[in-house]
A protein has these predicted regions:
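Eukaryotic intrinsically disordered, low-complexity regions enriched in proline/serine/threonine/glycine
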Residues: 1-8, 62
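Contiguous beta-strand segments within globular domains
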Residues: 5-20
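A short beta-turn/strand-edge loop motif at beta-sheet boundaries
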Residues: 9, 22-31, 76-81
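Beta-strand-rich binding-surface signature
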Residues: 14, 31, 86
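Aromatic-rich carbohydrate-binding modules that target alpha-glucans
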Residues: 30-79, 90-108
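Exposed beta-strand face motif in extracellular beta-rich ectodomains
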Residues: 81-87
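Low-complexity, Pro/Ser/Thr- and charge-rich linker/hinge segments at domain boundaries
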Residues: 109-115
Length: 115
């Protein structure tokens, strides 16, 4: 349902998020928006939680995709140190939210590579 491209990346890299919405509560949504939380600089939080044009995902075939640079996506300064990233998906009016059912309904954790 949720993958990253490339599979090996660091939080300082541009990467893509792919969301296969079939089989989720967003299966009939015409628009899907990427939302989430960045933990940075010793535990500070930056959140993106509204459906706005800059976090709208692009429908490609049967899935939604969004490429992002995390510091820009979360509005962080260039010297911010991102420690953790979490994402979830909403429809245009925010009435439907899809999170990680396999992890107790928490946001999807995106781990950077050790490489």
């Amino acid at each position: 349902m949720f993958t990253t491209t490339p599979s090996v990346f660091r939080y300082g890299d541009v990467f893509g998020i792919t969301f296969s919405h079939g089989g989720t509560a967003l299966k009939d949504a015409g628009e899907v928006y990427l939302c989430g939380t960045a933990i940075h600089d010793g535990g500070q939080k930056a959140e993106v939680s509204a459906a706005v044009p800059r976090n709208r995902m692009e429908l490609i075939s049967s899935r939604f995709e969004k490429y992002l640079y995390p510091k820009d996506f979360f509005g962080l300064p260039s010297d911010a140190v991102i420690e953790e990233l979490y994402f979830y998906f909403i429809n245009a009016d925010g009435s439907i939210v899809v999170k990680d059912d396999e992890n107790g309904g928490q946001e999807f954790f995106v781990e950077q590579s050790d490489e």
